[in-house]
C-alpha cells in the first residue's frame, strides 16, 4: 500500500480523522521552513501538503500569495524544494507527502523529469491545481509511470459525471473544496451541498476525502468529519501564523505547535 493508503487504514482502525497542514516550501527560508515542518509533524500532522513557490498561484488568496513571494524573494527554486523534500523524507520515512502546485512547474522541466524528481525525493502524491480532470490524462499517465498518485479537486458545483471521473482517477486522497473562490482563513463558509457531494463521492468509491479551504478552527475539523470527510486540510491559518511571527522563530514554532495540537485533537472522537 502507498503511504496515504496506509495512513487512512490506520486512522480508520483508530476511529480518527486526518489533519493535514499545508505550507509553502522555503517560506520564509530553507532552514526555518524545515523547522516549521518538523514542528507540524511533531505536534500531530498526519500527512503534509506542500506548495512550491510560484509567481502566479491560481487558487491562493493573499496570505499564501505572500508566502510564495517571501520564498521567491529569497531566491528559492524548485531545486531547493526537492532538496527539502528529500531531507523531510530522510528524517520521516513514513509521513505521506503530497504536493499542491500549478501546471507550469510540471511542464517546464517536462512531465517525465518532474515526476521522476518527485519519485526520487520521496513525494507520494501530486495535485495540479489548474489541470481539470477532463484534461488530466497525460499528467496521470506520467505520474503513474513514476509511482506518483494523482489527486484531483472536487469543486462544490461538481455534477455526477465530474464526481465519477474524479473518483475514478484520484488516488491517495480527494481534495474537497469547501466553497468557490481562493484560499483564505477568513472566509470560513462552506457550500450547502457538501454532504450530498460527499455521499456521491463515496458511492463512486472515491479515495478518502479531505476537506480544504477556510479550515482554521477545531470545530471546522469536527464538522468536516461529521459530514463524512476523512479529514481536513488547513493552509492559510498556518501560513498566517508564519507571517505574523517572521521576527521570532521561537514564537512562531510555539504558536504553530499549539495550533496543530488542537486541530489534530479535533480529529479524535
UniProtKB/Swiss-Prot annotation:
Q: Which reaction does it catalyse?
A: (1S,2R)-1-C-(indol-3-yl)glycerol 3-phosphate + L-serine = D-glyceraldehyde 3-phosphate + L-tryptophan + H2O
Q: Where is the active site?
A: 49 (proton acceptor), 60 (proton acceptor)
Q: Which SUPFAM superfamilies match?
A: Ribulose-phoshate binding barrel
Q: Which GO terms describe its molecular function?
A: tryptophan synthase activity
What EC number(s) has UniProt assigned to this enzyme? 4.2.1.20
Going by the record, the broad EC class of this enzyme is: lyase
Q: What pathway annotation does it carry?
A: Amino-acid biosynthesis; L-tryptophan biosynthesis; L-tryptophan from chorismate: step 5/5
Q: Which CDD domains match?
A: Tryptophan_synthase_alpha (cd04724)
Q: Which UniProt keywords apply?
A: Amino-acid biosynthesis, Aromatic amino acid biosynthesis, Lyase, Tryptophan biosynthesis
What PROSITE patterns does the database record attribute to this sequence?
TRP_SYNTHASE_ALPHA
Instruction: Offer a single GO CC term for the protein.
Output: cytosol
Stored Pfam families: Trp_syntA
Protein family membership = Belongs to the TrpA family.
Quaternary structure and partners: Tetramer of two alpha and two beta chains.
Q: What does this protein do?
A: The alpha subunit is responsible for the aldol cleavage of indoleglycerol phosphate to indole and glyceraldehyde 3-phosphate.
What is the protein named? Answer: Tryptophan synthase alpha chain
| Name of encoding gene | trpA
Amino acid at each position: 500500500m502507498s503511504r496515504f493508503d496506509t495512513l487512512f487504514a490506520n486512522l480508520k482502525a483508530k476511529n480518527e480523522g486526518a489533519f493535514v497542514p499545508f505550507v509553502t516550501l522555503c517560506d520564509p527560508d530553507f532552514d526555518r521552513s524545515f523547522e516549521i515542518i518538523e514542528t507540524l509533524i511533531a505536534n500531530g500532522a498526519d500527512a503534509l501538503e506542500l506548495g512550491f513557490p510560484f509567481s502566479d498561484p491560481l487558487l491562493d488568496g493573499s496570505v499564501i500569495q505572500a508566502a510564495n513571494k517571501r520564498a521567491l524573494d529569497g531566491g528559492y527554486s524548485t531545486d531547493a524544494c526537492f532538496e527539502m523534500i528529500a531531507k523531510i523524507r530522510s528524517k520521516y520515512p513514513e509521513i505521506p507527502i503530497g504536493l499542491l502546485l500549478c501546471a507550469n512547474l510540471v511542464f517546464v522541466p517536462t512531465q517525465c523529469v518532474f515526476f521522476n524528481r518527485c519519485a526520487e525525493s520521496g513525494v507520494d502524491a501530486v495535485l495540479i491545481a489548474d489541470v481539470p480532470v477532463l484534461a488530466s490524462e497525460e499528467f496521470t499517465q506520467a505520474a503513474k509511470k513514476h509511482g506518483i498518485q494523482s489527486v484531483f479537486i472536487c469543486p462544490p458545483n461538481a455534477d455526477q459525471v465530474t464526481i465519477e471521473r474524479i473518483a475514478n482517477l484520484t488516488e491517495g486522497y480527494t481534495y474537497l473544496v469547501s466553497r468557490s473562490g481562493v484560499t483564505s482563513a477568513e472566509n470560513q463558509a462552506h457550500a450547502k451541498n457538501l454532504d450530498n457531494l460527499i455521499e456521491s463521492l463515496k458511492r463512486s468509491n472515491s479515495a478518502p476525502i479531505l476537506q480544504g479551504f477556510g479550515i482554521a478552527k477545531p470545530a471546522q475539523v469536527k464538522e468536516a468529519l461529521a459530514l463524512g470527510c476523512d479529514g481536513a486540510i488547513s493552509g492559510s491559518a498556518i501560513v498566517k501564523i508564519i507571517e505574523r511571527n517572521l521576527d521570532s522563530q521561537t514564537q512562531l514554532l510555539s504558536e504553530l505547535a499549539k495550533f496543530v495540537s488542537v486541530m489534530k485533537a479535533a480529529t479524535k472522537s
